[in-house]
Amino acid sequence: MSRTRSCLDRVVAATILLVLLPALLVIMLVVRLSSPGPALFRQRRAGRNRDEFILYKFRSMRCEDSAGPAITVSGDCRITGVGAFLRRYKLDELPQFWNVMRGNMSLVGPRPKLPHHEGLDLPYRPGITGVATLAFRDEEKILAAIPRVQLDAFYEICIKPRKAQLDLEYMHSATPMSDLKQLWRTCSSCLFGPDELAVRESERLNLLVAAWLEITRDADESPSEVEIDCLKSF
């Protein structure tokens, strides 16, 4: 990452935190009052070159239910009413500007993964937003159609490779100007809905879900190697 890009990340993050400070304090208060537990959710994540750090979010789940499945879908009973609103508009991600200030993350980049995930040798700092984040903005809603016991397998086969491809293509040619464009796309997406890429990826993901459900309609049946290759070719 260039020194210019890193400095720009921190300047933008500091400005956003300063401007949004009153709103952040209000959100913290509402989260605390809406359900028992802290306002902030903290979790260890893997960053650039496997360097671990603590990621911050506004808590969107009940504390007693937060240790469930890693993949969250729409209608998940663990999500609070306030949490559902925060997640819908991505407001739960706002505390991560502090991670950018500390140098753990960038504004734009692949999302940070859990330390135990494979393939974590990222040459870039993870980001708050990115091409894959925007492309799969409706992921939770679409994944609700997949049976819970099959979610991990579906994600590994059908979603994870595509996200990695999109992020890698972007990061190979990323510049401060392209980052600013991604931030604008993120704001526009939150306020006005999905853009063309997100619509296209949602259509593709819906087709994958339909194909997966057809292949695995027998609960004891797992996709064959040939069927997995077909799914990956979508």
Task: Name each model feature, range by range.
Residues E169-M171:
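Acyl-group handling in specialized metabolite and lipid biosynthesis
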Residues H116, L143-I146, L205:
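Intracellular leaflet-associated regions of eukaryotic membrane-associated proteins
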Residues M1-C63, D121, S173-F234:
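A hydrophobic, helix-centered structural microdomain
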Residues V73-T133, L183:
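A short, structured surface patch at a secondary-structure boundary
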Residues A13, F41, T80-A84, L166:
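Positions in alpha-helical segments
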Residues F41-R78, T133-R162:
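Short, glycine-rich, amphipathic interfacial segments at transmembrane boundaries or analogous
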